[in-house]
């Protein structure tokens, strides 16, 4: 099999595109229009948000890779014809993919966090790191525990939908005057974001 094609299958490229689409739709179609208040600085720069979405995609891609890594023995029995880990990529190479993707995800998240909040950048980075831990824990320990495993996956997907609102909160926390001016608008967007978040949680 073509290794490039197999790599994109390994990271579930179609799933990543769907996550990116959901995140951008929530931010640019729901939240962004509501923040056109004329107040300079009410909306962070697009590069910072795009970098954060890239971070999320790297982290989730790493989660898919480590999931297949821990599933290799089961996949050898259940779907040997679709096996990628150990057949196309060795287990060591697969681990390298996971480490690289996760590192790039955390690095992108750190840079985005610093861009939107000089004083509280560690908060968003800590949440992204927690997502990394959740995805790894799901693959390594909790997948066989049906309720816990499904809960971790659902929370991870729902986080992608809630991320834009959290991003905006951390950005506005830099300037209390702007936060006060657009606070009502921010709270107005919350119910809609929560509806999409809950929908994503239960549909996973």
Regions found by a protein language model. Give the residues of each.
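Multi-pass alpha-helical membrane architecture of UbiA-family
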Residues: 1-204
């Amino acid at each position: 099999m073509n290794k490039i094609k197999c790599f994109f299958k390994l990271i579930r490229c179609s799933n990543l595109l769907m996550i990116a689409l959901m995140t951008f739709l929530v931010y640019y179609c729901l939240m962004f229009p509501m923040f056109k208040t004329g107040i300079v600085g009410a909306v962070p720069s697009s590069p910072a948000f795009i970098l954060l979405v890239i971070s999320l995609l790297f982290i989730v891609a790493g989660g898919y890779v480590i999931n297949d890594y821990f599933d290799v023995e089961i996949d050898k029995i259940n779907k040997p014809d679709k096996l990628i880990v150990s057949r196309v990529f060795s287990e060591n190479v697969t681990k390298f993919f996971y480490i690289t993707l996760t590192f790039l995800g955390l690095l992108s998240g750190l840079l985005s966090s610093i861009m939107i909040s000089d004083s509280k950048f560690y908060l968003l980075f800590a949440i992204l790191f927690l997502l990394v831990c959740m995805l790894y824990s799901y693959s390594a320990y909790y997948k066989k525990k049906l309720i816990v495993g499904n809960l971790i996956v659902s929370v991870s997907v729902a986080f992608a939908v809630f991320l834009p609102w959290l991003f905006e909160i951390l950005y506005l926390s830099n300037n209390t005057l702007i936060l006060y001016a657009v606070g009502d608008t921010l709270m107005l967007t919350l119910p809609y974001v929560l509806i999409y978040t809950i929908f994503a949680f239960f549909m996973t």
